Amino acid sequence: MNKTNEKKKSSLILKILKALLITLIVIALFVFGFYKLITHQWQDEPQTYDTTNQYIADLGDTMILAHRAGRRLFPQGTMMAFEGCINAETFKTDFFEFDVRVTKDDKLIILHDDTLDEVSNAVEYFGVTDVYPEDYTYDELYNLNMGEFFKDADGEMPYNGLRGDEIPDNLRVLTAEKALSYVEGCSEYYYSIEIKNSGYLGARAADILYDILSDMNLLDRVIVASFNKDVILYLEENYPDLYRSAYNMEAAGLFIDSIFNIDRPDGYYKFDVLQVPPDKYIANMGTSKLINYAHKNNVAVHYWTINDTDKMLFLQSIGADGIITDIPDVAYDTLKN
């Protein structure tokens, strides 16, 4: 009797193990198949659709977005950078891309990093590390040298060590309002502005930014971005007239939809622009399949951060609407000439 029970028990264990093995094989095949799908270089021909999105460019007319106003050419996000791009004789940019954060006194300054530690002499000036802009007033931050750690093409740091009156005005902390006023006084450009703050500060930044854009009649030439879902939801609820880009999960959703070519109704996607890296993560988003699908659904596609000329040309060839680059001069030579 005991032997019979042991045989039954062994048989049951064997069946369970076989079932588990089959399940694992099925899961592995599914994961492998899905991996192949999201990493595949789809070779669809670029298509033209009847769209209403002004940021969808004609094939071959890929727009150039100066990342942080051309961060490899000039100290990022400074007036010097905006001046340099606008006054350059050898290249032009279509967009200025920059990030904004709120100060203690509700000024919207141009800054990518969480703190000013690595782009200025803030640690030395304030005597502390982790100098967050929201802890200081604009007037306090205006004393900083925002070109402190900038390296030029030769690896030199031409503005390092400037202090006090030695710091030119175009190397000091810059507000979004001043930057936009200067640029618009020169010519009309497009802008991609990312709100870096989250939570209450993110909402406050959105309010301030909207007021600036509205007062300057720039609502139709600005794409507002954020990686923070709470900020996106706040924008959607309070400022539906703004053009905006997708946040992470929205971008992932469109990407998956594009692989399976899911037929979505008009207006399904609540964003106007997809701004993604082509191949930074596991997923291969730099494909004509994704661009065609986005265009079909009235969504423009910008890729970041593209500093390789071969990649620039490839993305242009598959229908990219814009590339975000640290070197707008090289991008202009590559894409426009």
Where are these regions (language model features)?
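Phosphate-group recognition and catalysis centered on beta-loop-alpha active-site segments
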Residues: 2-337
